[in-house]
Amino acid sequence: FDFDIADDLTKKLGLLLLQGWSSQSEERKINFNKWVSRHSWVEDYATFVVIREEFNMLPWWEWPQEFKIKNNKFLKSWIKKKSEEILIKKLIQWHLDEQWSVIKNFAKSRNIKLIGDLPFYVSRDSADVWSNKSLFSIFKNGDLIFQSGVPPDYFSSTGQLWGTPTYFWS
């Protein structure tokens, strides 16, 4: 997989979506705003990605202090300045969600079941962890308190450490 090509294509897609945004019908814009309201994660995700790009893809715990914590005055002001870039990220997610819905509906119409069967943990350097630190086993500086993995078994005599934070269950 060529990440550079994927990044370039994603940037081009984002610019095309933004260029077409002003000519969208009011109904389409309303649908987008409803989608954003129903998917509260997208605000944090889009903000996170734009900040990450601002700092050359550094992980969030290496960002300047004022960017590490969501919902501070500085960050709110910065978000307003970057509103167009953040909109692009949200438009891309909306576009992808629309495509995924088409795929799901096609599969369902053919009685094809889509399943996922992988252990799932969130990356430490993700919008989810950055914006919801209290839900994960991490220190304030981003270091892991506990990390996911599996003990030794048939597949690995030494076990595995995956380097992703575990969920912080109270």
Describe each PLM feature range.
Residues 48, 107, 117:
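Conserved, mostly hydrophobic/aromatic
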Residues 1-94, 122-170:
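Alpha-amylase-like alpha-glycosidases and glucanotransferases acting on alpha-linked glucans and related
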Residues 111-115:
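Structural preference for beta-strand elements that scaffold enzyme active sites
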Residues 92, 96-109:
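Active-site neighborhood of glycoside hydrolase catalytic domains
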